[in-house]
């Protein structure tokens, strides 16, 4: 029992502090019904909730520059002003904005990049304007959008928005044309988990036979379904081809223009070092062999040159060849002089007196 009381007391003590912290983080500023034509610049930059409703603000370029000063805004209310168009990057610096209400203006044009930068936006109210058509790509930056209100405009056809977190969609009060052009939205409403607000009031205005039907339950003709299927097939093929072409183009562009990263630079350095080292080793091994081949080639060329020179000399001086031949023959001729007379013995043998004299001397 004491523990329970202590827990209640602790909770009661912490609750006021939590409320005070929340009140400290929220800084509201109410400038509604001030007859302003421009967004004031003297507001604290810490403002988180800004109400500028029921003025004469047009949200021109000057207003967009002033809005950039209030980057901490989480809620912005611009109802019942004189805004006729939303231009590209009108809210580009409001990175924390979660609620944007621009109902009750005269907006007829919404450029494709109007909501760039509103990545945290969760609720968007564009009701009671003069919007005729919307590019579905306009909502692409709104990845966290949960509530979209397009009530009371002049929209006749509308493609299914690519909003992954959308929960509530309000479309009543528009002159919907329930022909084949609206079949995609019709199928999307019946297959997605999005809740169509005021479904029984979101009625077809054309054709006459469908005026009492909701756009979600209207019976579309068989021709519309067949046309829709063929359109999906064509879109898929074109998307696949364009994706392949764009990917190949991006790959080519990247390979040609994208700077190499550190890993590529390191890899190139390693390869260059290995190639240079291999080249040096190859040169060190092959240099002696190449030197011997070059030396033998030079020696061979030298011998050929001497032989050619010798032959050329002989060809030019044939007389010298005869002289050299005569000289060589004289030098190599050996003339023996007969010092002793040979005596023919009775037995038919020739006696050499030189031998006999030597024998006599030996006997003596």
From Swiss-Prot:
Residues 21-264 are extracellular. SUPFAM superfamilies: L domain-like. Residues 286-364 are cytoplasmic. The chain crosses the membrane at residues 265-285. Pfam families: LRR19-TM, LRR_8. Keywords: Glycoprotein, Leucine-rich repeat, Membrane, Repeat, Signal, Transmembrane, Transmembrane helix. Strongly expressed in kidney, also expressed in spleen, intestine and colon. Highly expressed in epithelial cells. In kidney, mainly expressed in renal collecting duct epithelial cells. Residues 1-20 form the signal peptide. It is a single-pass type I membrane protein. GO terms for cellular component: plasma membrane. InterPro entries: Cys-rich_flank_reg_C, Leu-rich_rpt, Leu-rich_rpt_typical-subtyp, LRR_dom_sf. Activated by TLR ligands such as LPS, bacterial DNA and peptidoglycan. Disruption phenotype: Knockout mice display increased longevity compared with the cohoused wild-type littermates. Almost all mutant mice remain alive, whereas most of the wild-type mice (>80%) di after 2 years on standard chow. Mutant body weights are lower than those of wild-type. Gut tissues of wild-type mice show slight inflammation whereas mutant mouse gut tissues do not. The gut tissues of mutant mice are more yellow and the colon tissues are thinner in mutant mice than in WT mice and the ceca are enlarged significantly. GO terms for biological process: host-mediated regulation of intestinal microbiota composition; positive regulation of canonical NF-kappaB signal transduction; positive regulation of non-canonical NF-kappaB signal transduction; regulation of cytokine production; regulation of inflammatory response; toll-like receptor signaling pathway. One of its GO terms (molecular function) is signaling receptor activity. Interacts with TRAF2 and TRAF6. This is Leucine-rich repeat-containing protein 19.
């Amino acid at each position: 029992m004491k523990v329970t009381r202590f827990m209640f007391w602790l909770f009661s003590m912490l609750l006021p502090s939590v409320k005070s912290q929340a009140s400290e983080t929220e800084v509201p500023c109410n400038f509604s019904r001030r007859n302003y034509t421009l967004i004031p610049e003297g507001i604290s930059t810490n403002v988180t909730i800004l109400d500028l409703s029921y003025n004469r603000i047009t949200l021109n370029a000057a207003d967009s520059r002033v809005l950039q000063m209030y980057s901490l805004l989480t809620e912005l209310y611009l109802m019942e002003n004189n805004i006729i168009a939303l231009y590209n990057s009108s809210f580009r610096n409001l990175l924390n904005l979660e609620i944007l209400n621009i109902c009750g203006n005269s907006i007829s044009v919404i450029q494709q990049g109007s909501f760039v930068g509103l990545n945290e936006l969760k609720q968007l109210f564009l009701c009671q304007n003069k919007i005729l058509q919307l590019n579905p790509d306009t909502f692409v930056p709104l990845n966290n959008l949960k509530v979209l209100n397009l009530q009371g405009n002049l929209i006749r056809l509308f493609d299914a928005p690519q909003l992954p977190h959308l929960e509530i969609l309000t479309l009543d009060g528009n002159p919907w044309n329930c022909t084949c052009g609206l079949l995609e939205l019709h199928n999307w409403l019946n297959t997605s988990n999005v809740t169509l607000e005021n479904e029984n009031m979101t009625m077809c205005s054309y054709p006459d036979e469908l005026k009492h039907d909701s756009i979600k339950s209207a019976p579309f003709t068989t021709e519309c379904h067949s046309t829709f299927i063929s359109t999906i097939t064509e879109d898929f093929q074109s998307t696949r081809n364009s994706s392949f072409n764009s990917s190949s183009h991006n790959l080519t562009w990247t390979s040609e223009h994208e700077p190499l990263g550190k890993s590529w630079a390191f890899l190139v350095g390693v390869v260059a070092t290995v190639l240079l080292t291999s080249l040096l080793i190859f040169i060190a091994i092959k240099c002696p062999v190449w030197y011997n081949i070059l030396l033998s080639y030079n020696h061979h060329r030298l011998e050929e040159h001497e032989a050619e020179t010798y032959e050329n000399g002989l060809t030019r001086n044939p007389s010298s060849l005869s002289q050299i031949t005569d000289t060589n023959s004289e030098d190599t001729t050996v003339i023996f002089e007969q010092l002793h007379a040979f005596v023919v013995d009775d037995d038919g043998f020739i006696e050499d007196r030189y031998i006999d004299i030597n024998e006599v001397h030996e006997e003596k």
